[in-house]
Amino acid sequence: YIESLLSGRHVELYPHNEAAYRAIMRGFKQHRIGTVVQATGTGKSYLLARYIADHAKENILVFAPNITILDEIRKAVGFSIPQVTYRTFQSLIRNREDNGLLRADHILIDEFHHFGAEIWGSALQEVIENNPCAYVLGTSATPIRPEGMIDTVDLYFEGNLFYELT
């Protein structure tokens, strides 16, 4: 955090996201995997951007359902970081043979509830299993998938809900 401030690569957060960010840091002291659930429009992209900025020297994989959301996160970061790889969920399927080559210290998943879909979920699970020491953070406004009422926090994140704002 201090290093990101001094380098000028700091992402300011509103108080509710600052509280979420502190909860993430506390959560990662006990667990390597967890989630933040916040309502639509509350700034989850900025929360991820802050995490990226604060870990800019480490390898980070960022997954989101589409290019628009990935671009939103990139814009919120505000600067280019060579150690960050941005991928859509579809790329997990399209480039599945490459998933074993993806290496990360941190895996960030925006709109993680989409991984309740079996094909994406299994591809994501491969990436997580191939990076057993990576910290994994998911964000979503809707963690429960309506078909079958699947709780994706329990299914993919060991039930670790670091912060919730609805």
Regions picked out by a protein language model, each given a short descriptive name:
Residues 24, 47-55, 123:
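Hydrophobic residues on the short alpha-helix immediately C-terminal to a glycine-rich phosphate/catalytic loop
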Residues 30-51:
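Walker A/P-loop
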Residues 41, 65, 141-142:
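Conserved H-loop
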Residues 59, 83, 104-106, 132-137:
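Loop/turn-to-beta-strand initiation segments
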Residues 63-103:
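Inter-Walker segment of RecA-like/P-loop motor cores
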Residues 110-112:
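Walker B catalytic acidic pair
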Residues 114-166:
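Post-DEXD/H (motif II) to motif III coupling segment of the RecA-like Helicase ATP-binding lobe
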